[in-house]
Amino acid sequence: MAAPVRLGRKRPLPACPNPLFVRWLTEWRDEATRSRRRTRFVFQKALRSLRRYPLPLRSGKEAKILQHFGDGLCRMLDERLQRHRTSGGDHAPDSPSGENSPAPQGRLAEVQDSSMPVPAQPKAGGSGSYWPARHSGARVILLVLYREHLNPNGHHFLTKEELLQRCAQKSPRVAPGSARPWPALRSLLHRNLVLRTHQPARYSLTPEGLELAQKLAESEGLSLLNVGIGPKEPPGEETAVPGAASAELASEAGVQQQPLELRPGEYRVLLCVDIGETRGGGHRPELLRELQRLHVTHTVRKLHVGDFVWVAQETNPRDPANPGELVLDHIVERKRLDDLCSSIIDGRFREQKFRLKRCGLERRVYLVEEHGSVHNLSLPESTLLQAVTNTQVIDGFFVKRTADIKESAAYLALLTRGLQRLYQGHTLRSRPWGTPGNPESGAMTSPNPLCSLLTFSDFNAGAIKNKAQSVREVFARQLMQVRGVSGEKAAALVDRYSTPASLLAAYDACATPKEQETLLSTIKCGRLQRNLGPALSRTLSQLYCSYGPLT
């Protein structure tokens, strides 16, 4: 008789380790689906992530280690768990028993952004999800602004130059190359910890930033006395700020620790031609030949904005391979009529003007070059003429029209020689990115006037088109794709609603569709502070509130 087959004991499948959390998330998802709220997607993603987690969770705060669990959702779970325990339910959240109660309505809007990844876990004693590292520029900025906030004689804000100087005073010896590329100041602005107002920019702490800065000061053992209540602290009570953090802040602002200064006779003015103007077919190589024929000192390099700029290049640099260069306050964008026509059709026209106005150079020239017959273009001549007129009257550009490429080269040669005479005898000094220049300061009071200019590296790096963008920047670009939304209108919209989630939450809070259509109509836009208007507000509400396909 054959021996009986011995079968191993079958391992039972584990029960759901967090049934209460699963039940509550399911309830909230179903309720959001019934009310047609977009938070249903947040709950669904969190529910899927929770079901894959094999271990029990004791609180909603512990669920933050899972994907798609943000501060708002974890707080909702903790509040629901507390209500469950108060009503006599099991104390363990993984108990199968629970209480069926509707989700708190006041918290649904808080999880609009809960699917965003948490950048850092808080340390002991900290609240919230963001806690800047000890050797980070963000920590330095918060502490410096906190000192200014505590100063009874201060303005409770700092300009960018003042902010850089305060950080440099805390660590005057910065090792070259020790800066990291993470833009600390921009990160704090996006986290709504630092507020930027006015022009030139002023930086101050928001209520959330003030709370975090106070906890940072307490964590470092700083009291009200040694945090400093004045702009100048005693030497023995200064807080040590890491050198790398100060260098990181300087790198983010696009400045050098030692400003570049070029005295008369130590530099030459030359024309920089974008490499895109020299490649390709047609008449592009002819431009360089014309410049050479006119004996214009020029160089060809990659420009991220504009087609022509002028730089003051150091003549006797310490490093011949890397001479110091300062960008003069003039930039030229060249457009042939056929290129102007195509750029208007595909939207590049508005975007290029918007980027030119933000490049840091104040004297902008729009060079329009005739090319062939106007009747062969895709747009009528009146449309092109109106676009050029708007560029001059509304955008404030200087518009120059030329007959052909030879006349364009002659105009560039004339500008080059004019700038060489204009800056002759001037002392040039670099300035931080984002601060206004003063090319005419001291022209009447000093035989050697001082001009503050951007370095070429800062100018070109600040104009990169495809650099990493925040949600706010992407949202602004998305709004500008809507017909009628200019750069100024998009800026006004993102000042009120910085993310799509905040705009959708505002739409969800409206009682009627009519209220949704007029939600944005009273937002002030532009220098004249005119209303956005009901027509554009209705268009945007249809775009963001329609669940079906747009018609």
Swiss-Prot record:
The active site is at residues 274, 277, 307. InterPro entries: DNA_pol_lamdba_lyase_dom_sf (IPR027421), EME1/EME2_C (IPR042530), ERCC4_domain (IPR006166), Mus81 (IPR033309), Restrct_endonuc-II-like (IPR011335), WH-like_DNA-bd_sf (IPR036388), WH_MUS81 (IPR047417), XPF_nuclease_Mus81 (IPR047416). One of its GO terms (biological process) is double-strand break repair via break-induced replication. Residues 270-372 form the ERCC4 domain. Residues 471-545 are annotated as: Helix-hairpin-helix (2HhH). Residues 84-93 have a biased composition (Basic and acidic residues). Changing residue 307 to A: Loss of endonuclease activity. Residues 131-230 are annotated as: Winged helix domain (WHD). Changing residue 191 to E: Reduced 5 prime flap and nHJ cleavages but only mild effect on the cleavage of 3 prime flap. SUPFAM superfamilies: DNA polymerase beta, N-terminal domain-like, Restriction endonuclease-like. This is Structure-specific endonuclease subunit MUS81. The gene is MUS81.
